[in-house]
Amino acid sequence: MNPPILRSLHPARARGFTLIEMLVALLILAVMSALGYSTYRAARISASRAQESLARTREIEFGLRIMLQDLAEAVPRPIRDPLGTTRRPSFRGGPGQTTLLELTRSGWSNTAGMQRSTLQRVSYALVGDKIQRSYQTVLDPTSTNQPVVQDLLTGVTSITLNFLDPNQAWNTQWPPPTLPLPDSEWTRPIAVEILIEFKDWGKIRRLVEVAG
């Protein structure tokens, strides 16, 4: 009879990773790293877009607020043209003019205590896809005075203004052609409707009452 085979009392030694196991582990690590980077990149892009959207919202809100404030503080004060021969109406706007809107407004802040009027002449024009706001440093400018120009709104496709007269009729031009002198130099509309179409925001409508 053959003697029984004695089993080793020592446990089997741990085997090392095989080449296939190492490749699988590396593949899993690579996939997890790629997923982690993709998630991080997506989060960065999302945060960047959110910041851009917020900045755009602030730009549009600021531009509209300036426009509405100018209209709300319009006053009946015509100005002399640069040559001093004629007067421009205190409020004018509409298609077919050099500027979309031009008016005299009150409330020009003077924190520096300069010797100037608190009335200000401002105008708006659509230049390319930008609405520009301009103002003169003096109320009755001469040919040597240069306006201060600011890009107020960008990405603009179109802008339309409508003016409500005292008879509750809407006009696309102000002063209305039927309004005789000198009334046309001093009369302001009761309200102004602003329709602006943006490339990214679509159409925005604002209605503002002009100071009485």
Task: Place the predicted regions along the sequence by residue.
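Structured surface patches comprising rigid loops and adjacent beta-strands/short helices at the edges
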Residues: 77-80, 151-163
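Extracytoplasmic beta-strand-rich oligomerization domains located immediately C-terminal to a leader/signal peptide
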Residues: 35-142
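A short, polar/proline- and glycine-enriched secondary-structure boundary/capping micro-motif
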Residues: 113, 141-150, 172-173
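N-terminal single-pass transmembrane signal-anchor helix
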Residues: 1-2, 13-40
